[in-house]
């Protein structure tokens, strides 16, 4: 049995569930339950706070889990788990920020004894120590941005995705501590167990196939047979286009090809110029 730890709420929870669904690992309705079955009787899901998942996986409570890299570092478990996959979403940076009107404009302006408020005391302390700085860390559980304006701290370290929230709260970023994305991690002992490793690899492969497919599109078309060589130049595809005869018209071929989503506009325009017709551009669920 494999226990997969997933965030019970938050901005990455819904996207993760959708990816697992597309991967074929559908989770049964859970209501308020902390556990849920999946379509695979050998895989069960545990719902937990995202910040607790790194420790659960490191300690072997869960075999595999999905959470943010920032939380993995905050729990000091980056060397205690095995990293399997980067989802490349849920992007955020843990940054140091000071009030816009302060004289603190860079890391070089920090002085020993200053106060810094944060929800990430471990990473913040570790980073400051690497800069030979001894600041007093004020641990908060939310609304960190207000700390410098009510005399609690001189500056903050906080997560930001776009920097908009910092600007709205009259704060300026002066340094980046860590860049975070959503990660799939595994317990190291579980990866040594042959049976568990096989099932964990299946989970990894399924998720990877969905993430990869999200960047691709399937193009289908009918095209003049005498334009096949030109088509090959326009759309090399993953393994070259698949070309087959059209029974009703020996002067036309059917062409299928998988291409990068970013190339679709250019490719379709070029295909139209050489006479391609009935062009379909379709999303892909998975690519293995």
Curated annotation (Swiss-Prot):
The enzyme's E.C. designation: 2.4.2.17
Keywords: Amino-acid biosynthesis, ATP-binding, Cytoplasm, Glycosyltransferase, Histidine biosynthesis, Magnesium, Metal-binding, Nucleotide-binding, Transferase
Molecular function per GO: ATP binding; ATP phosphoribosyltransferase activity; magnesium ion binding
Primary location recorded for the protein, binned into one broad class: cytoplasm
Gene Ontology biological-process entries: L-histidine biosynthetic process
Cofactor(s) this protein requires: Mg(2+)
Activity regulation, short description: Feedback inhibited by histidine.
Top-level division of the source organism's lineage: Archaea
InterPro entries found in the cross-reference section: ATP-PRT_HisG_long, ATP_PRibTrfase_cat, ATP_PRibTrfase_CS, ATP_PRibTrfase_HisG, HisG_C, N-reg_PII-like_a/b, N-reg_PII/ATP_PRibTrfase_C
Catalyzed reactions: 1-(5-phospho-beta-D-ribosyl)-ATP + diphosphate = 5-phospho-alpha-D-ribose 1-diphosphate + ATP
Pfam family, one: HisG_C
The protein's role, per its UniProt record: Catalyzes the condensation of ATP and 5-phosphoribose 1-diphosphate to form N'-(5'-phosphoribosyl)-ATP (PR-ATP). Has a crucial role in the pathway because the rate of histidine biosynthesis seems to be controlled primarily by regulation of HisG enzymatic activity.
HAMAP family associated with the record: HisG_Long
Protein name: ATP phosphoribosyltransferase
Organism encoding this protein: Methanococcus aeolicus (strain ATCC BAA-1280 / DSM 17508 / OCM 812 / Nankai-3)
Gene that produces this protein: hisG
